[in-house]
Regions:
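Short, surface-exposed linear patches
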Residues: 1, 25-27, 45, 51-53, ...
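Short histidine-centered loop motifs in beta-beta connectors
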Residues: 7, 13-17, 21, 50-53
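Short beta-strand-turn/beta-hairpin segments enriched in glycine/proline and small hydrophobics
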Residues: 1-10, 27-43
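Short hydrophobic beta/alpha edge segments that flank linear recognition/processing sites
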Residues: 23-39, 60-69
Length: 69
């Protein structure tokens, strides 16, 4: 399952590590957009297979940032 961003911004902080088992709505990373912190959460439970961004990266709305099993 691909996880995408809902807003454009900068990856401020990564909260989850590859290989972690995530619960529904668990925070994967936090974006900074217009001086607001916006969490990107797991839409379902599963193992985090891949992170496609790192802290400091700029993302656009709809960019894939992570892959969940």
């Amino acid at each position: 399952m691909k996880i995408t961003t809902e807003v454009a911004g900068k990856v401020w902080k990564i909260e989850a590590q590859v290989g972690a088992k995530l619960a529904v709505d668990e925070v994967i990373l936090i974006l900074e957009s217009m001086k607001m912190e916006i969490p990107v959460v797991a839409p379902g439970a599963g193992k985090l297979l891949e992170l496609q961004v790192k802290e400091g990266d700029t993302v656009k709305e709809g960019d894939v940032v992570a892959v969940l099993e």
